[in-house]
């Protein structure tokens, strides 16, 4: 009975999260479309074709079944499963932030982990300063051009982050990751849309759709996952890992 109650509680929570996301999508249809955004050409497309391998990987928390991974350029993997099954733990192990229980991970290209904390750019520092700190050798004029392609004009990129909209902060935070040196060829997305307002959610979706690199993504927002066009779905449960072709 306890297991059944826990399962129903998880289902109710998932339905509430999806309902909230659906309300945001409905609101989006009632406002004007945002100007088209563009990433600087070539980002995420360079370097190794094989980005990451994991062999007999067992997580420290959640699912205890071993996992084999071979992630290549252009793949977009949606990781789905119940709360507590190990989705976020997997991303942190792949990023090197947590040690695996057993097995190994080989990273053949730069990657970055994006979560709601990183996307919550705040404080007195400007977007331009944040991006320059991530790529000190870059030409300032080139960085300004790249930020302009994201819809961030010369005035906005000089303002303190706490004076910007949520959407502008998301663009700035993503720019500091995507235009870093070295630039990532793969993004690990851990519930990136959580706690974002409508404008920020739209900006996040548009930029990630436009980015050509590989993605491994965890989100309760099914619409966001679908918009990012996963090439594969990795289902995790207490029994183990299972590959699917669609959500």
Where are these regions (language model features)?
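Coupling and communication elements adjacent to P-loop NTPase active sites across diverse families
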Residues: 1-61, 72
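ABC ATP-binding cassette signature C-motif
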Residues: 46-247
């Amino acid at each position: 009975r306890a297991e059944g109650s826990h399962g129903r509680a998880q289902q109710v929570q998932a339905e509430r999260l999806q309902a909230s996301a659906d309300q945001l999508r409905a609101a989006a249809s009632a406002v004007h479309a945002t100007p088209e955004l563009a990433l600087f050409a070539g980002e995420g497309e360079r370097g190794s074709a094989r980005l990451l391998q994991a062999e007999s990987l067992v997580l420290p928390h959640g699912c205890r079944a071993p996992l084999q991974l071979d992630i290549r350029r252009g793949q977009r993997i949606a990781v789905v499963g119940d709360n507590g099954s190990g989705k976020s733990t997997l991303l942190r192990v792949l990023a090197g932030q947590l040690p695996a229980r057993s097995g190994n991970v080989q990273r053949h290209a730069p990657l970055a982990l994006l979560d709601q904390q990183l996307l919550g750019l705040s404080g007195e520092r400007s977007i331009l300063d944040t991006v320059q700190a991530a790529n000190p050798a870059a030409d300032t004029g080139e960085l300004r051009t790249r930020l302009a392609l994201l819809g961030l004009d010369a005035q906005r990129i000089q303002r303190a982050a706490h004076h910007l909209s949520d959407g502008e902060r998301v663009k700035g935070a993503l720019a500091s990751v995507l235009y870093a040196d070295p630039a990532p060829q793969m993004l690990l997305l851990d519930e990136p849309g959580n706690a974002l307002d409508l404008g920020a959610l739209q900006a996040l979706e548009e930029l990630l759709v436009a980015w050509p690199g590989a993605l491994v993504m965890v989100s309760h927002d099914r619409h966001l996952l679908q918009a990012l066009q996963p090439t594969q779905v990795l289902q995790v449960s207490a029994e183990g890992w299972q590959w699917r072709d669609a959500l």
